Amino acid sequence: VASELTLEELYSELQAIDRDRSFFPVWLQIVSAAVISGTIMVLFGGKMTDLPVTLIIGGWGYAVYLYSLKFFRIKFLSEFLSSLLIGIAAIYSVRFGLGSNQDLIIIGCVMPLVPGVQITNAIRDLLAGHYVSGVSRGTEAMMTATMIGFAIAFIFQLFY
């Protein structure tokens, strides 16, 4: 090996890598969430007339999630709040005639918040025999899904 590292150098390099987390810019995350929302709504059988409103509500809902996460620093509260506002916006968009199917609009818009990767990793950990991390990840994923479900159920209970 041409250049070997000491343990101290290796540790400092690992710390530098850990500090230098490169995320996508916030605007790109919001645009991506909007596109995913619209795509999921269409895949579930939604009409193309609902696409613009789904794109707007999906992007807006994810922006609320990101900014409330910075403000509150509680992931579950941010997911609840953004799902709550997505539900309200979807219901009012249908009532005002901007959309036609509030259920598919809501499904598409909350999909970027759904913890699909966490659920997959939890199942993978459990199948690999890593029970502590599997149960931990699974519990976090279920809490996230529960917060999303509670928010939408609360909105439906409030409006109907």
Task: Set out the residue ranges of the language-model regions.
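Cytosolic regulatory and coupling regions of membrane transport/channel systems
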Residues: 1-26
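Catalytic cores of large soluble enzymes that bind and process phosphate-bearing ligands
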Residues: 2, 6, 52, 56, ...
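Short helix-adjacent coil turns
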Residues: 4-5, 46, 129-130
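Short helix-terminus and kink motifs of transmembrane alpha helices
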Residues: 8, 50, 117-121
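C-terminal ends of transmembrane helices
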Residues: 16-17, 42, 61-72, 118-131
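Loop-to-transmembrane-helix entry motif
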Residues: 17, 21, 75, 142-145
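Core alpha-helical transmembrane segments of integral membrane proteins
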Residues: 23-94, 99-100
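Generic detector of multi-pass transmembrane helix bundles and their immediately adjacent loops
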Residues: 95-160
